[in-house]
Amino acid sequence: MNAAVRPVSADTAIADISLAAWGRKEILIAETEMPGLMATREEFAAAQPLKGARIAGSLHMTIQTAVLIETLKALGAEVRWASCNIFSTQDHAAAAIAETGTPVFAIKGESLADYWDYTHRIFEFGAAGTEGEGPNMILDDGGDATMLLHLGMRAEKDLSVLDNPASEEEKIAFAAIRAKLAQDPTWYTRKSAHIIGVTEETTTGVHRLNEMSAKGTLKFRAINVNDSVTKSKFDNLYGCRESLVDGIKRATDVMIAGKVAVVAGYGDVGKGCAQALRALSAQVWVTEIDPINALQAAMEGYKVVTMEWAADKADIFVTTTGNRDIIRHEHMVAMKNEAIVCNIGHFDNEIDVASIEQYQWEEIKPQVDHITFPDGKKIILLAKGRLVNLGCATGHPSFVMSASFANQTIAQIELFTKPDAYEVGKVYVLPKILDEKVARLHLKKVGAMLTELTDGQAAYIGVSKQGPYKPETYRY
């Protein structure tokens, strides 16, 4: 365990409980910017729809997540929580939640060994062998919690599945699973036994769920929260539009205007990042594999290039794809002196950080590193290739996270209260009427007035006056 840890109880791992008062003040401010979550509390508090839910949460332990946790608890749930990224925790947020008695396992800058230990600990509900052992719900971001249980169950039957880790992180994760099985050979099966389902926050985690579902190996019901319109078209786009440059600026104090910035990927995240950089008068180039997205970027006025072409010309590089090996060793070797390299995709494999570990590293400040190449050229790597907006800043603004987390809360209620409506092993999205509900909850805060259809108008286009207003195939 990190030497800096001063836990409030044996069932908690945080940096410093004395930060709780600061965290509580920021939580109160965030609540005023999170109308969706607060309205959900008000609507469901009396009914307690999550009473009896034991939620294992793996999601960035930020101030905004603290509001989510307290919403889940207000609706009756019991919660255990860890961060889904070693750099994304806000220690004062973790302290504020720990002070309320919720088990929290999250420290900014925790080691990978601690990360996997903490992820194991979110499943430790109840006494062994009882009906209350383990969680009955998972709230995941990136899929690590879900993956851990599935891989652990496979390893119970065949340890050889842990024989060939593909990365340093997998090596540490696999070692943690081996150690757990040496202590308790049926731990993963027991912790999974009562799980009704999982709600997944982000693109990368949804990809993992879809892969398992297609192979027939997904053991739980799942709701894909990421593809709710009020998540992907808001958090991914508008959230990244504000938090990317916040991270770059806090880390480097660089002037964006006049720089050439490359955004790898032009999905919702890439679109938001490109808009932000252009708004600060950078010259923005985009790399893409998909001709539709590439054409979208070109029609918005961005120059569409390849990373090979751009590597020696640009000043700032941002990966947004959710894929691996986007910026490789040969790209970094070609870069200008003092080029800034960062990632805003969920995992750290978009930039081949392992390939430059052989060179000289100098930490400028936490999550900001100078890497010196053999020819003396230096690049600036942010957050060691992990999420720059959470590693070097504090993530998305509260308002946009209110929409994402209202979706999470509604998805948890859906799965927990209506399990028979969802088939084990399949991945679902929330009904459009609930997506529209989340949007409605946020309109007043931004001063928006919604026009109401007349009976004749509703009949003419064949929709209910209460919605949903668009077919499932509609792309916003």
UniProtKB/Swiss-Prot annotation:
Biochemical pathway: Amino-acid biosynthesis; L-homocysteine biosynthesis; L-homocysteine from S-adenosyl-L-homocysteine: step 1/1
Highest taxon, organism lineage: Bacteria
Reaction(s) catalysed (UniProt annotation): S-adenosyl-L-homocysteine + H2O = L-homocysteine + adenosine
Subcellular location: Cytoplasm
Keyword Cytoplasm: yes
Regions annotated as coiled coil: none
This protein's UniProt keywords: Cytoplasm, Hydrolase, NAD, One-carbon metabolism
Name of the protein: Adenosylhomocysteinase
GN (gene name): ahcY
